[in-house]
Amino acid sequence: IIIGSIYINFGGRYYECMSDCADLHSMFQRCRSIRVESGMFMIYDRPGYTGNQYFMKRGGYADYMGKAGMNNCVRSCRMIPSHSSTFRIRLYEHFDMGGEMMELTSDCPNLVMERFNVHDIFSCNVTDGNWLFYEHPNYRGRMYLIRPGEYKRFSEWGGRSARVGSIRRIMDY
């Protein structure tokens, strides 16, 4: 893939993608490499922007699939718009923006130790920028793309649980 452009399988037959694509299955069966020539993308191992999510920025990922613990299925990809001004996200301890609220404007490598003192984020509201939620502290584990808008429950961002250990702004590197 080539994203923004993204090339999937840049060592052989490839597919160039320059925007969101909800179903890449018809383009190829397997993906062994990815090259992002410009922009940033989130790739998914299921169609319709579902399943495991993987963040891609400019660069070549010749053996990314094995290193990231990802199978060789890339079934959808979403372009992440560049954002360079302020970042703002509100995190809530309950569904539907209920309970204690915490606002972030910068990265947080350990949500429990540094700021929120809870392990679970059940809902959030992004007013500025794009963010990545990570399942564990220090930007490890499953990741989830959080775009501007309201998320009334963790399942709306693709979360399997409300567990969020760290949060990072997606900046144009």
Language model features: what each stretch is:
Residues 1-173:
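Compact beta-sheet-dominated domain cores in extracellular/mature segments
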